[in-house]
Amino acid sequence: MQFIRTDRFKRDFRDLPERIKRRAEQALRFLSANLRHPSLRAKKMEGQRDPEGRDIWEARVSRSHRFTFAIDGETYILYRIGPHDIERHPV
């Protein structure tokens, strides 16, 4: 699997504390290997789709931080990363 990091994801990531950045990198490694890795707790966000109509997923970085993404074939499109409240604006 490969990743496409949107500009919004890159900005969100840049603003994270260093310890959360490290955990996020680990979470992305887990995602690359296995969408169902237990620490990610990945799930589709009910009623959320990206502009192309793909389901939006959320996964866990830490207790307080999440990231959102869509799946397009063999590619993960990373939309947002940050505190739990990013779920209000996942794309």
Task: Identify the function of each model-found stretch.
Residues R5-R41:
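N-terminal first-folded block
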Residues Q2, K10-E18, R22, P51-R54, ...:
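Enriched for short, Lys/Arg-rich terminal
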Residues Q26, R41, M45-Q48, Y76, ...:
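Flexible domain-boundary/linker segments
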